[in-house]
């Protein structure tokens, strides 16, 4: 029997995208009415309660830039408290560390090389089966707030309902980082509105109203709260929070280049200020969930789409795309119903962006549709093992904008090692336990040759499983018919306002 065939997710031209098969608890002849009633009773007894999901997605928040992760500067008391109640993946990575590719992979459970979503400002094909559509088919109410960055029709343009990939309640915008006057669209109203305060607090305030309404309803819900901080511009953080961080007093990591030290201190003041303000806003969201009694049956996730280099390893502030940990490693806390003894446990095995959707489906007892490429890690989440290990595949298919001078790469991250290869050969080999700031590249050292070969073989295996031929940037641009703009090596977008989006001019970056 086809999975939810009668549900139409989009317009008829792209309807019935789900083709995976889901077993029905019991099928019985409708002529046997008494038996039918009996089966209903069994279904009601055996059907597990569907958990709600609140997914908190931030932007450019480095995995190490939290109090619970050991950052000596930043103040994040509410997320520190959540970490004590959740499973903490210490080596969560972004499959392609930049906004649009991560978000597309998160919603589809697929790799950027498969969907073609490996650049910013691309159009996620409507035919792709996405997170909200799957949960909606299971009877979920779906809601989305904040930054979207998947429609590919100008960053300030209205996103019509058929382009929201299954999200019904909608207060979002394609892309803006004007935090003190952030525009958004209210559901099906095509007239732009503006959040009335610093956007993390405004978005959470509206989300809390939604949660209050949902708490009175038995319908399970999927709520994605997409907060665009602490992505630059950092100077726009509220002064109250900037006053908490004197640039001169900040402790810099030892891998920050001297030439970027002054700039990094200046930017970190605003970066940490955004982080602390966002932590406070998230605290209000978590407090509301507790007050409404939603904690007992809600999966809560806190994560980010990518990190940011902030002067580390000779890469200027604002830059990502590269394979160093400051760029690829992101926070990932997950709290789920019945967590009990697993509270505060850490998992050192990596979780990758495509793994998130199938893992949420696994935790929700929902059949994983065919075509999803990520791995269901729900058993590891429910039975966390700090000693477990696996390889996460990270890729930059076509470096663009500020990263344009770099070569494309493929890399694997394990709980201990990072190994990367560009189109010209091996480029990175770090022992992240012995060398947490990745300052000692082990490539070519005789004593590590065997290990390097093993990691190279594992990378080749991951590429083969995915069918990734690992070709040049131009090959993939031509394959997907992508054309960079004349003035910037990136997908053109319009109505670029000061303080919105990515850096405006490419600056050479060494990898």
From Swiss-Prot:
<dbReference type="Pfam" id="PF00884">
    <property type="entry name" value="Sulfatase"/>
</dbReference>
<feature type="active site" description="Nucleophile">
    <location>
        <position position="99"/>
    </location>
</feature>
<keyword id="KW-0106">Calcium</keyword>
<feature type="active site">
    <location>
        <position position="149"/>
    </location>
</feature>
<dbReference type="GO" id="GO:0005886">
    <property type="term" value="C:plasma membrane"/>
</dbReference>
<feature type="lipid moiety-binding region" description="S-diacylglycerol cysteine">
    <location>
        <position position="35"/>
    </location>
</feature>
<keyword id="KW-1003">Cell membrane</keyword>
<feature type="signal peptide">
    <location>
        <begin position="1"/>
        <end position="34"/>
    </location>
</feature>
<keyword id="KW-0472">Membrane</keyword>
<dbReference type="InterPro" id="IPR017850">
    <property type="entry name" value="Alkaline_phosphatase_core_sf"/>
</dbReference>
<dbReference type="InterPro" id="IPR000917">
    <property type="entry name" value="Sulfatase_N"/>
</dbReference>
<keyword id="KW-0564">Palmitate</keyword>
<dbReference type="GO" id="GO:0046872">
    <property type="term" value="F:metal ion binding"/>
</dbReference>
<keyword id="KW-0732">Signal</keyword>
<protein>
    <recommendedName>
        <fullName>Ulvan-active sulfatase</fullName>
        <ecNumber>3.1.6.-</ecNumber>
    </recommendedName>
</protein>
<feature type="binding site">
    <location>
        <position position="59"/>
    </location>
    <ligand>
        <name>Ca(2+)</name>
    </ligand>
</feature>
<feature type="modified residue" description="3-oxoalanine (Cys)">
    <location>
        <position position="99"/>
    </location>
</feature>
<keyword id="KW-0378">Hydrolase</keyword>
<dbReference type="GO" id="GO:0004065">
    <property type="term" value="F:arylsulfatase activity"/>
</dbReference>
<feature type="lipid moiety-binding region" description="N-palmitoyl cysteine">
    <location>
        <position position="35"/>
    </location>
</feature>
<comment type="similarity">
    <text>Belongs to the sulfatase family.</text>
</comment>
<comment type="function">
    <text>Sulfatase involved in ulvan degradation. Ulvan is the main polysaccharide component of the Ulvales (green seaweed) cell wall. It is composed of disaccharide building blocks comprising 3-sulfated rhamnose (Rha3S) linked to D-glucuronic acid (GlcA), L-iduronic acid (IduA), or D-xylose (Xyl).</text>
</comment>
<dbReference type="InterPro" id="IPR050738">
    <property type="entry name" value="Sulfatase"/>
</dbReference>
<keyword id="KW-0479">Metal-binding</keyword>
<keyword id="KW-0449">Lipoprotein</keyword>
<feature type="binding site">
    <location>
        <position position="305"/>
    </location>
    <ligand>
        <name>Ca(2+)</name>
    </ligand>
</feature>
<feature type="binding site" description="via 3-oxoalanine">
    <location>
        <position position="99"/>
    </location>
    <ligand>
        <name>Ca(2+)</name>
    </ligand>
</feature>
